[in-house]
């Protein structure tokens, strides 16, 4: 696969899980002889929700919740057939969303 690039975007709520999955991908790609660029940490998305505690009065009584979405980017430059095969067989954690694009 000459002059190709595989771009892998990872998303997860747990930063330890996403770092572990990224390390597995990088180690697998390097072991099969491909060049790796990354992992590049992308900005973390923070979603905040404010909920009223009391059902009727007391507008000042509220709870605030936050969900953080961590993202990483890994580029695999000039992958070999062995690299693609190893990445397809790689079993990642269930809490990690993986998007793969060829470029």
From Swiss-Prot:
Keywords: Ribonucleoprotein, Ribosomal protein. GO terms for cellular component: ribonucleoprotein complex; ribosome. GO terms for biological process: translation. Part of the 30S ribosomal subunit. NCBIfam families: PRK00596.1, rpsJ_bact. HAMAP family: Ribosomal_uS10. This is Small ribosomal subunit protein uS10. It comes from Alteromonas mediterranea (strain DSM 17117 / CIP 110805 / LMG 28347 / Deep ecotype). The gene is rpsJ.
């Amino acid at each position: 696969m000459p002059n190709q690039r595989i771009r892998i975007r990872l998303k997860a709520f747990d930063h330890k899980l996403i770092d572990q999955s990224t390390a597995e991908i990088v180690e697998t790609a390097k072991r099969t002889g491909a060049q790796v660029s990354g992992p590049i940490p992308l900005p973390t998305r923070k979603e905040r929700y404010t909920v009223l505690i009391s059902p009727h009065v007391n507008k000042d009584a509220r709870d605030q919740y936050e969900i953080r979405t961590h993202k990483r980017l890994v580029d695999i430059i000039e992958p070999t057939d062995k690299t693609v095969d190893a990445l397809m067989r790689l079993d990642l954690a269930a809490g990690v969303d993986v998007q793969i694009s060829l470029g």
